[in-house]
């Protein structure tokens, strides 16, 4: 507990309301951050690559490792939502990306990050190839914004996956749905989801996501309380 507190204070600052947040300025991103090889396993009979679609993307979405032993990089929401990415990869399977596109995405993808923001909405999604079109095991899409009053067009999509939810008994349906309006601190894996360019400017501001989410903490009286267990 003491070590966690030291990391928290070192990477964060306090605003006028007494709420803690990361100190990274917009445009800044940690240098030399690790890109660990994803830990991937089958879940309820579904392999890491799912049952169709973009196998490489699905494998990243289905990773289950916990941020290289908890070493998450504190990055501000503004920095994350403004990260660059190639403009010509929308709905293009990763096997068909150019080398320059791969290099541009690899610069940030697969880094364990931690950021703060406000939950603008939560939705239990339908069936997807990532989860082998299971009706029982589906993602929760969460829209994260810099301010509680922001529209989803300014949000970053972050996702709860069935594989991670299976390891987090506190992530009940009611707990996840009740996050709307709360200030949260999210830890998870940075991922570029190229499959939804039509949502830009409508229900998201970027194709970058935190996917999967590994830890969720809620601000309660100026301190972060985990809802993982």
Predicted regions: what they are:
Residues 9-11:
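C-terminal motif of bacterial Sec signal peptides marking the signal peptidase cleavage site
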Residues 13-15:
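Bacterial signal peptide processing site
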